[in-house]
Structure formats: structure tokens, C-alpha cells
From Swiss-Prot:
Keyword Ribonucleoprotein: no
Sequence ranges of Polar residues compositional bias: 301-311, 444-453, 481-505
Protein name: Beta-1,4-N-acetylgalactosaminyltransferase 3
Species this chain originates from: Mus musculus (Mouse)
Role noted for this protein: Transfers N-acetylgalactosamine (GalNAc) from UDP-GalNAc to N-acetylglucosamine-beta-benzyl with a beta-1,4-linkage to form N,N'-diacetyllactosediamine, GalNAc-beta-1,4-GlcNAc structures in N-linked glycans and probably O-linked glycans. Mediates the N,N'-diacetyllactosediamine formation on gastric mucosa.
Length: 986
């Protein structure tokens, strides 16, 4: 072995030997590294200087090659880019959609390239078939601002499409015609707003001019000085810059639709001129973009300010249905274990008496065999906020549907004694007897009278149009009886009021025509100030007039005649412009004869005398009048048959006593079986299907406490032979009394006389149990409905997020939509489960639904035949499962159709009582009845739901029918739908 020094030297020389052997390889690596570093530095420098032609944007490689090959290209801006409409990434589009309804629009700042080719036009977005007159109503539109019906352009800021119920959003850039101060003005019918930015950025937008806010304001075309807000303050602009602007316009169904924006120099005498094409440019080119591509649409203060249509917290909801209810969130509470309920009740056969089960039905006759269910507690599906326009809930005739018709339900209290200011006498006899007595029975009337009041009780109130006249005449008579006017005191005797025993109208003798004379200014003034007494029409002209009213009016006429005859007053002769058929001074003698007025010089004096002596009276109001009234519950008048004449009633209400009795018996059985393990927390919902022969079926939904854990019970129970509401009691007696008031004897409720047990005997109906794990498939056929498809997908995403339910899926059958890529929209959504099927040809709803049904392979899953324009409550999936029972029952929820301009936050509309297009049914049951009728309903629809209903009932299935809270059908435009073609109007 060598010395240690020699060994150390060998170790140091070994790396040198290795480097010498690999020197060439190391040298090559060093050269490559230096070259790459040099290239990197060169690229960075060229990018900063803008000199690299590869750094430019060209439409294609061919354009790039031409640019590199050309030797004669003059020097241009090195940052020049060839324009191609930008398709933002899916992520950006999703962000744009999520921000469409909140204040994050302030962060919207998408750099959209601008080209000189954009000059001459502005972007125009049209929102069709949306009622209202205010800009706020436009912002409340579900699709505003991202999903308009039409995207087009405009050549000048003056548009009048001659259409109704629409909204416009015009946006782009303004190029000022000069430097300096400029004023803007806007005119429109109805409301409109003009917004302008400080520069070309959308973030600096400010409101400069407007026409109203409430929807009641409008102007004529070119009328810029009607409202103070129409003309803006002077704004400093530069002709070398461009400025982003927006115009919002809302038009209702009245007037001449127009909106125009004008400008002028801030000089004395300068006139406004409409902004024309040389001073406009597009914000972006939308020609090749699909309707579902919305990332380029600017979201600004103009499009979003005040856009939330949710009422403030301190404001009451416009409909009681919008108030919080435990039913709305019950789906979040876990279900009680089935094993704990198995032996709580005995099993019993279930076959209700109202099933059709094979009986032959005529076409569309099944609607008559659908029964409504009762609910407890009140779910406030009655549209009470709509009863100003529709009072059908009170079961009054169309003639009597006014507030005065409720007079028969109150009984006026008799005054104990007369005060000094209200002496006893004729006024009591007339007013009290005719106005406050009990409702009289029908009396014989003339043929004309019977046409207006046939089949109704005679009311003591005055009919529309008669009340004012009768009331003032009545007070005139009463005031005259007490003798406030001295010249008439001599005539205060009962002999002046002969009673008439018939309803024959008073015959007035014809007056001979007298040439009219020109009145002096004083006479004309007296004539204008004359308090005229309206002539009462003959009895036959006013339907519904009672005998007392007819007699009383005749007495008034005779009384006035006595007054004039005693003072030698003759009636004036009608002159030009004074029609005797209208307001005249009534005059008649006791025998009903009137002497003709003599022509001559005394005519004007007689007329002046008439004007001078006509008395004026103020009506006496009895502010201390009290009355008595009984409890009224008009729900007692309703039956479980579908009422096609009333679409605001909502669900039938189950009597509280009955619901509590069934719940009490069930909880007692549950406590006995589980040894008191569960305690009742709250009765959330009880539904009853009435069966008068075999006992009703109840659906109990209870919140129970299992120790400290909250669980829910949602189960069907049956009562054998117990009918619930048929037992006698105080509430039932009041209901029969109310029926006697409103119904005619032949239409009164027939009471079942069979005796029944005081306590219900509960049991589990065999085979009638719902599956809480069943998969629900929402099937929707579509064609060219991009904005609604996007909304439907967003609603389904929201349901998935809120409920966390993994057992539902959506199926969209698409008839080759051209306005969006439906399949791509589904792929980029957050839906867990979906299916897409592309079809061809014209839109056919039945065929589209059947194609979606065929995609479902599991026969034990639920098919929900759906519509595209639906707003779903959060618990819709759980509700569909609970009301679909395989082999037993289908579910047809009743949807509320919103009026034009209404929203789910401000719902105005009606229940779709006769529509069954929204239907939940098990796949096995639907296959059993043959599915959709695709042969008969091809190019037409409307009736396919009733035809399907006929087959469901004939198969022995029940159809559950309930009005669902917060279940809305959006109002939508029908233009372009259902294979409709457009026709150019002259």
C-alpha cells in the first residue's frame, strides 16, 4: 500500500481524468446552453420592442406568410392585430353567467378589441313580450341583460319598431362631433335612460338623462323638454376619443313606441339633433356568436342597478305563499327508519271507491274523475292578492262580484234612541227599512228585470250606477222632511207621497221643442254651477232594483213635483246642448201631467227662478252605525272536484280538528310500539284524499325528536270506514249554514248519513308506499330556446347544490337547435347526471318526450314530464317522490302561470287548473299504458296531456292533484316557438 499522500493525490486527479475523457460532450452542452440563453434574451427584447412578426395576431398562417413575404409594406403600428370575434373560455363565460344577477358586475372588465370597421352602428339587444313601462321592470326580466331574444345593430339612436311590450338595450361607443361642452337629451314612450361613460371603459358609466321612473311618464317623438330629467348637464368631450354609452328603453302596449337620443353644443340657441351613424360604433361584433355565448356582453351599472326584485326585509311579501313555511325545507330533515314503523299499524287492503279501473272513458273525460286533496295547515296557495281582479273564490255570480255583494252577510244594529241631530221620522222609515232589514225573498218583476237578476236574491243595496243617485235623492227627501228649508216646510206631509203598488215605470209626457236662445254670460255661469239632479231610469232599465227602491223613487219624484207646484215653478225647456235624456231637473205633478211651457219673454226669468230655488243637501252619514256578523269560512263551500271556473282558490283546507285527531291516534300507536322514543316536535303537513265510502287516505308529515336528533315522518295511512269531516259538530253546522246562505237549495251539499266511529282506525295501505331513493328524471324537449335552456340548466344546478340529492337526472331531447350547443352546455355544467339526445325535423313535444322516456332503462325510476319555462321550489324532487307510488298513483302538480311582467318574487297570475302537462309517473306505469301518443299528436299539441290522463285513469291509477307552493310557469314569448313562421307586416 502507498503512502496516504499518494492516495489523496490519486483521488484529486480522478475528476480531472473524467473531464478529459468527456470534454467534447461537456463542451457541446455548454454551447447549447449559451445559445438557448441568447435566444431567450433576444425573444424577450423583441417582444418588448414589438418587432417580432410572430408576436402579431393574424387570422391564419396564410396571412402571416403573406405579411412576411411582402417587401413593400409601409411601416405600421407594430401592435396591429387582425380581428376575429373572441370566444371567451368556458370559465370566463361561467363567471359571466354567475355574475349576471349580483353586484359583481363592477368587476367586469373584459378587453374587447375595437376596430375602425365598427363605425356606423351600435349594438341592439331586444327583450320581447315583457309587460310594464318602467326601466326597473326591464331589469326584473329573468334574461336581462345576458340573454336577449334578438341581437342586432342600429344605425342611429332613434328607433320605433311599432311593436308592444318589449325592452331595448342599445350600447356601443360615441364619437363626439366636436371638442368642448355637449348636452344630451332623450325622448321616449314609455320610460328610457341614457348612460355615458367618462371614457371607453364600461366602469365609468353615469346616468345623464331619463324619461321617468314609475312607468307613467312618456313623451311625444322629439319632445325633449317635457321633463326636467330629459336634458343632461353639459359634458366635456373630446372629438379624438370614444365614449362608451348605453340606452335602456321600456315600452308597454299603448301609445306610439319610440326612443331617441339627441345632442347639441352648449351654446345659446343650439338645437338638438339625433345622434346619427357617423358618430356611432359597435362595442363588439356578435354576428358569428351563438346565443349562449355571453362573455362579451358588458355588465354595467345601467344593466344591474336596482335589478334585484326581491322585496326589502322590512317589507311584507306581495303574496302570502312567499312567506316561510316548514314545508319548504322539510326535505333537509332525515327520514325516520322504516324498521321503526313496520309494526306500528296493521296492514289493510287499499282500493279506493273513486278509481275508474277499466271503465270506458270518452276522449278527455278523465278530467272529471280527478279529485283534489285537502291540506293542513293552511299552505296559503290561495291567491288572495289576485282577488281584486278575480273574486271567484266567494262563488258569486259575475253580476254580483263587487264588494257591496257582501252586504247580505252583515246585519245592521238598530239604533237604541235618536239623538238630537238625527230625529225620528220619515228618514228612519225609508233608510232603515230599505237598507238595513233582512234580505227579502224574490218578488215578481218585469221581464226586463228578470234578465239581470234571475236566480239571485234581491239585494237591498243599490246597483252600480244607481247608488249615487238614490243616495242623494234619499238624503234630499230625509232632509226636507226635517224641515231645514223654510219655503218647503208647508209641503211636509205624508199626503204628498202616494205609494205605488206596481213597478210600472213613470211615463213622462213629451215636451214640445222650443227654439233655444242665447244666454247671457251671467245665465251661462248660473247654468254651469247648477246642481243637477240625475233623472232616475225606469225600473225596467236597471236590473236588480227592489220593490222598495222603485216605490221610493216614485215618492221622491212626487215630492219634488209638489215643491215646484207649490212655488209655481215650471220645468225648463231643453235648449241646445242640454239633452233631456241626461242630467235634468226632475219635475212632475201629483197626477203625472206637466203643462207645456209658454214661449215668450218670461222663459229666462222662469229658468233663473228654477236655478235659484233648487235646494242643495249634504248627505247624512251615520258614523256610529254598528252591525253583527257571523264567522265565514268559504272553504266550507268547496268540494274535491276540479273547479274549472276558479283558478285562484288554491288547495282545499283540511279541518284542524280532523288533522289533529288522525295525528293523535298515530302518535299514540307509535309511542306504544317504540316505548315513547319519539316526541312530536311539529305537524308540518297533513294531506287527505277523501273517500266517502271506504274511508279517507292521509299523508302525515311530522317532525319528531329522537332524543336530541330531529327526524321526520312522511308516510301514508288509511282510515277504514272513517270519513273524518262528516261527523256532526259545530264547524260542520256553521258550514251548512253558510251553504244555505250562498247555495240554492238544489245545489246544497248532500250530507252522508251513515254513522261512523268517533275515533279513526289507522292502518298501512297495502302496496301504497313511496320510495325515497327513486331516481327522478326530468325530461324536456327543446328547439332554439337558448336563453331558456341556459336558465333550466342553472335551475337544475341550483337544485343539486341546495338539496345535495344525487338521485335525479335531466334528459334534454334537442331538435337540432341552431342558437346554442346544448350538449356542450350540459358538459360544462355542474350537473352530476344528465343525458342528451339530438333529434331532427320539426319540434314535436310528444315525440320528444317519448324519445327521452326511451333513454331511461330502470323501470322503477320516476319520469317527470317537464316544461322548459318552470321555476322549481327547492323541495320539488322530494315532493315528486312522495306523491308517486309505483302501480298506484301518478302526480300532476298544479303550476302557477305568471302574468306578463310578473316574477317569482312578485307573483301575479293564476293556477293552471286544467293543465296536466307537468306529470310525474313511474317508468313501469308509463310503459304499461303505452307512453306518449306520438301518432296523433305530431305537428300539433294541446290536448296530449288530457289524452294521457284518460289512459292513466283507465289503467286504475290515481292522479294526485295539488297546488305547489313557489312552483311557477314563467311568462314567455311565443315568437319563433313551435315551428311558427314570421310574416312581414305592412
Amino acid at each position: 500500500m502507498g503512502s496516504p499522500r499518494a492516495a489523496l493525490l490519486m483521488l484529486l486527479l480522478r475528476p480531472i481524468k473524467l473531464l478529459r475523457r468527456r470534454f467534447r460532450l461537456l463542451l457541446l452542452l455548454a454551447v447549447v446552453s449559451v445559445g438557448l440563453w441568447t435566444l431567450y434574451l433576444e425573444l424577450v427584447a423583441s417582444a418588448q420592442a414589438g418587432g417580432n412578426p410572430l408576436n402579431h395576431r393574424y387570422g391564419s398562417w396564410r396571412e402571416l406568410a403573406k405579411a412576411l413575404a411582402s417587401r413593400n409594406i409601409p411601416a405600421v403600428d407594430p401592435n396591429l392585430q387582425f380581428y376575429r370575434p373572441q370566444r371567451l373560455s368556458l370559465k370566463d363565460q361561467e363567471i359571466a353567467r354567475s355574475r349576471s344577477r349580483n353586484s359583481s358586475y363592477l368587476k367586469w372588465n373584459k378587453p374587447v378589441p375595437w376596430l375602425s370597421e365598427f363605425r356606423g352602428h351600435a349594438n341592439l339587444h331586444v327583450f320581447e313580450d315583457w309587460c310594464g313601462s318602467s326601466i326597473q321592470q326591464l331589469r326584473n326580466n329573468l334574461h336581462f341583460p345576458l340573454y336577449p331574444h334578438i341581437r342586432t345593430t342600429l344605425r342611429k339612436l332613434a328607433v320605433s319598431p311599432k311593436w308592444t311590450n318589449y325592452g331595448l338595450r342599445i350600447f356601443g361607443y360615441l364619437h363626439p362631433f366636436t371638442d368642448g361642452k355637449i348636452q344630451f337629451a332623450i325622448a321616449a314612450d314609455d320610460n328610457a335612460e341614457f348612460w355615458l361613460s367618462r371614457d371607453d371603459q364600461v366602469s365609468g358609466l353615469q346616468l345623464l338623462a331619463s324619461v321617468g321612473k314609475t312607468g307613467k311618464e312618456w313623451t311625444a317623438p322629439g319632445e325633449f323638454g317635457k321633463f326636467q330629467s330629459q336634458i343632461s348637464k353639459p359634458v366635456s368631450l373630446s372629438a379624438s376619443l370614444r365614449y362608451y354609452f348605453e340606452v335602456l328603453h321600456k315600452q308597454n302596449d299603448e301609445g306610439t313606441d319610440h326612443v331617441e337620443v339627441a345632442w347639441r353644443r352648449n351654446d345659446p340657441g343650439a338645437k338638438f339633433t339625433i345622434i346619427d351613424s357617423p358618430f356611432l360604433s359597435l362595442f363588439t361584433n356578435e354576428t358569428i356568436l351563438r346565443m349562449d355565448e355571453v362573455g362579451h356582453i358588458p355588465q354595467t351599472a345601467a344593466s344591474h342597478v336596482g335589478s334585484s326584485n326581491t322585496p326589502p326585509r322590512d317589507e311584507q311579501p306581495p303574496a302570502d305563499m312567499l312567506r316561510p313555511d316548514p314545508r319548504d325545507t322539510l326535505f333537509r330533515v332525515p327520514l325516520i327508519a322504516k324498521s321503526h314503523l313496520r309494526h306500528v299499524l296493521p296492514d289493510c287492503p287499499y282500493k279506493p271507491s273513486y278509481l275508474v279501473d277499466g271503465l270506458p272513458l270518452q276522449r278527455y273525460q278523465g278530467l272529471r274523475f280527478v279529485h283534489l286533496s285537502f291540506v293542513y295547515p293552511n299552505d296559503y296557495t290561495r291567491l288572495s292578492h289576485m282577488e281584486t281582479h278575480n273574486k271567484c273564490f266567494y262563488q258569486e255570480s259575475a253580476y254580483d262580484q263587487d264588494r257591496s255583494s257582501f252586504q247580505e252577510y252583515i246585519k245592521m244594529d238598530k239604533p237604541e234612541k235618536h239623538g238630537p241631530e238625527q230625529p225620528a221620522g220619515l228618514e228612519d222609515g225609508l233608510l232603515e227599512e230599505s237598507q238595513y232589514e233582512d234580505v227579502p225573498e224574490e218578488i215578481p218583476t218585469s221581464q226586463d228585470q228578470n234578465t239581470g237578476i234571475q236566480g239571485r236574491k234581491q239585494k237591498t243595496i243599490s246597483t252600480p250606477g244607481l247608488g249615487v243617485t238614490d243616495y242623494h235623492l234619499r238624503k234630499l227627501l230625509a232632509r226636507s222632511q226635517s224641515g231645514p228649508v223654510a219655503p218647503l216646510s208647508k209641503q211636509n206631509s205624508t199626503t204628498a207621497f202616494p205609494t205605488r203598488t206596481s213597478n210600472i215605470p213613470v211615463q213622462r209626457p213629451e215636451k214640445s221643442p222650443v227654439p233655444s236662445r242665447d244666454l247671457s254670460h251671467s245665465d251661462q255661469g248660473a247654468r254651469r254651477n247648477l246642481p243637477l239632479i240625475q233623472r232616475a231610469r225606469p225600473t225596467g232599465d236597471r236590473p236588480g232594483k227592489t220593490l222598495e227602491q222603485s216605490q221610493w223613487l216614485n215618492q221622491v219624484e212626487s215630492f219634488i213635483a209638489e215643491q215646484r207646484r207649490g212655488d209655481r215653478i215650471e220645468p225648463p225647456t231643453p235648449s241646445r246642448g242640454w239633452r233631456p235624456e241626461e242630467d235634468v231637473v226632475i219635475a212632475a205633478d201629483q197626477e203625472g201631467e206637466v203643462e207645456e211651457e209658454e214661449e215668450g219673454e218670461d222663459e229666462e226669468e222662469d229658468m233663473s227662478e228654477v236655478f235659484e230655488y233648487v235646494p242643495m243637501f249634504d248627505p247624512v252619514v251615520n258614523w256610529g252605525q254598528t252591525f253583527s256578523a257571523q264567522n265565514l269560512d268559504f272553504q266550507a263551500l268547496r268540494t274535491d272536484w276540479i273547479d274549472l271556473n276558479c283558478n285562484t282558490s288554491g288547495n282545499l283546507l283540511l279541518p284542524e280538528q280532523e288533522a289533529l285527531e288522525v295525528t293523535r291516534v298515530f302518535l299514540r300507536k307509535l309511542s306504544q310500539r317504540t316505548r315513547g322514543r319519539y316526541q312530536l316536535q311539529r305537524i308540518v303537513n297533513v294531506e287527505k284524499r277523501q273517500d266517502r265510502l271506504r274511508g279517507g287516505r292521509y299523508f302525515l308529515e311530522l317532525e319528531l325528536l329522537d332524543g336530541q336528533r330531529l327526524v321526520r315522518l312522511s308516510e301514508y295511512v288509511s282510515t277504514r270506514g272513517w270519513r273524518g269531516g262528516d261527523h256532526p259538530g259545530r264547524e260542520d253546522t256553521e258550514a251548512r249554514n253558510l251553504q244555505g246562505l250562498v247555495w240554492s237549495p238544489r245545489n246544497r251539499h248532500r250530507h252522508v248519513l251513515n254513522a261512523q266511529d268517533p275515533e279513526p282506525k289507522l292502518c298501512w295501505p297495502q302496496g301504497f308506499s313511496w320510495n325515497h331513493r327513486a331516481v327522478v328524471h326530468f325530461i324536456v324537449p327543446v328547439k332554439n330556446q337558448a336563453r331558456w335552456v341556459q336558465q333550466f340548466i342553472r335551475d337544475m344546478e341550483s337544485l343539486s347544490q341546495v338539496t345535495g340529492d344525487a338521485h335525479f337526472s335531466i334528459i334534454i331531447t334537442d331538435y337540432s337547435s341552431e342558437d346554442m350547443d346544448v350538449e356542450m352546455a350540459l358538459k360544462r355544467s355542474r350537473l352530476r347526471s344528465y343525458q342528451y339526445l339530438k333529434l331532427s325535423g320539426n319540434f314535436e313535444r310528444s315525440a320528444g318526450l317519448q324519445a327521452g322516456i326511451d333513454l331511461v332503462k330502470d323501470p322503477h325510476s320516476i319520469i317527470f314530464l317537464c316544461d322548459l319555462h318552470i321555476h322549481f321550489p327547492a323541495g320539488i324532487i322530494d315532493t315528486i317522490r312522495k306523491h308517486c307510488v309505483e302501480g298506484k298513483m301518478a302526480f300532476a302538480p298544479m303550476v302557477m302561470r305568471l302574468h306578463c311582467g310578473a316574477t317569482p318574487q312578485w307573483p301575479e297570475g293564476y293556477w293552471e287548473v286544467n293543465g296536466f302537462g307537468l306529470l310525474g309517473i313511474y317508468k313501469s306505469d308509463l310503459d304499461k299504458i303505452g307512453g306518449m301518443n306520438t301518432k296523433e299528436f305530431r305537428d300539433r299539441w294541446g290536448g296530449e296531456d288530457w289524452e294521457l290522463l284518460d289512459r292513466i285513469l283507465q289503467a286504475g291509477l290515481e292522479v294526485e292533484r295539488l297546488s305547489l307552493r313557489n312552483f311557477f310557469h314563467h311568462f314567455h314569448s311565443k315568437r319563433g316557438m313551435w315551428n311558427r313562421r314570421q310574416m312581414k307586416m305592412p
